[in-house]
Amino acid sequence: MSIMRRILCLAVVIFIINDVSSQGLGNNKNWKKNGMSLSSPGNKKPTGNNAVPQKSKMNNMNQNSLSQPKRSSPPGNSMYNMANQGPMGMMGGFGMGMNNKQMREFMIARRTHGVSPFLKKKICHMAKVAPPVNGQMPSPPQLYAQGFKIRRIGKWFSQDLDWSEGVAMCHNKEMEHRGCEKTPSSKWGRMFPGMGGMGGMGGMGGMMMGNRPMASCDVTKPNSCGNPALMKCSKYHKDRFGMPVCCATSEMTANQLENMGF
């Protein structure tokens, strides 16, 4: 019994010491808040055996607070959250709600100038249009008839101009497909800002088509946009005057023109 009593008393003493030391640290914090430090003449310095442990404990606390960096979000965390929100957050204008795997598939489809079956189905589903048996997009007039507006889908272009325009149908009617040229010169580009697409290909259009007020073209003439390998006359994209406009034939062409500053 005597051993048990000693152990119990020792535990009580340790508890009291810990409680007193914790209160002492709390008082030290209050002293610092009031503008006083432990070393000021008006305060008594801690003496006895508790002085060293208290000082070392506070030093350890300060060192730990200095040595441990502040917690911050991992690099790219905002992009990760944006990616989880779908391309609307990541790319700024898709709004198709694709997850990361679907997004990678979409990017591969862009780089290879191809269209994955998933992308076709996703676009048709987004447009609330049942895809035909052959898996192709409905024609733009059909989408127009259903009241669907045109929207851009980014920088993606197809070698097939009709499919490229079909993709463009899934975005906003006020914004033309990025490859569809509407301002062939910097003069008209300043007068009509934003009409030449994201890259602004007016200068190249002006060199290929001459000094026209707008980049209009004739759908019955294959060469009305200059080099048919670079630009084609669109049957569906029209300027604000109702005239057909020239479109880049591929993403590569559009990117080349954009890199040249147009």
Swiss-Prot record:
It comes from the Eukaryota. It is found in: Secreted. One of its GO terms (cellular component) is extracellular region. Keywords: Secreted, Signal. Residues 26-35 have a biased composition (Low complexity). Residues 1-22 form the signal peptide. Residues 36-84 have a biased composition (Polar residues). Residues 26-84 are annotated as: Disordered. This is Methionine-rich nacre protein. It comes from Pinctada maxima (Silver-lipped pearl oyster). The lineage of its organism: Eukaryota, Metazoa, Spiralia, Lophotrochozoa, Mollusca.
